[in-house]
Amino acid sequence: NEQVNEFRNRPLSNTVYPVLWVDALYEKVRVDGRIVSMAILIVFGVDENGHRDIIAVEPMAEESRSPYGVLFQDLKDRGLTTPKLIISDAHSGLVSAIQESFPGASWQRCKVHFMRNILAYVPQKEKKSFASVIKEIWLAPTADLARKRAYDVMDAYAKRFPKAVQCLENGLEDSLTFYAFPKLDARKISSSNMIERLNREIRRRTSVVGIFPNEASYVRLMTTYLMEYAVDWSVSRAYLSQDSIEATLLIAA
């Protein structure tokens, strides 16, 4: 417990994290005799050397009007400085909290979540073929070419999948933010896939638990698992190259 609390509350003032990823992990937890789906908010960062770190493991503050705002304020209280880029899905409460808490930071809408949002408006039998079409948008070498590909898709499918096209149009620009950071690995900063892979691994490990008896046990076990990954990452090769991080900090300065 002491190690878990120390990890979750450690100061962040001695490290700069230019890039953050934010996501939530849901598990079944027993609360007041009921079984509920409870979220833990996880924030990953890449430091100036390009190494990954886990900087927040926080249960969703359901009683708060802005649980993400509470999370970000806690990070700032621990010494986190405003990052250059934050990657997440487009949950409205999350996006507004990012804008309010970190003015000046760029926000990248996770392209994988965005594709799922778009495909939700496409008939099941046509999802696979349409997914292969829209995926090409974010593989374009430049933002201008990505926009052109997106507009071509909109023109071609406006009548066939009007709601999907509207979704694409509404969220397109936020999904192209990563092009403003050309020195960084586009595959890694255009989505939160890294967190999703980790979440799948954690779910595999928590499946033996089934239902957590309370929130404290949930937070404790999640943090313990994540601490193990943080240790591994600290001695593994950089996730983003140090040169690309330094170049990004210079450009954004």
PLM region spans:
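A short, charged helix-loop
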Residues: 60, 118, 129-133, 137, ...
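Amphipathic alpha-helical transducer elements in NTP-driven molecular machines
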Residues: 19, 37, 62-69, 88-95, ...
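Acidic/histidine-rich catalytic cores and adjacent linkers
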Residues: 136-253
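Conserved beta-strand -> loop -> alpha-helix junction used to position metal-binding or nucleic-acid-contacting
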Residues: 85-92, 97-133
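Secondary-structure boundary/capping positions in well-ordered alpha/beta enzyme cores
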Residues: 82, 105-106, 164, 175
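RNase H-like nuclease fold core
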Residues: 1-87, 92, 96, 101-104, ...
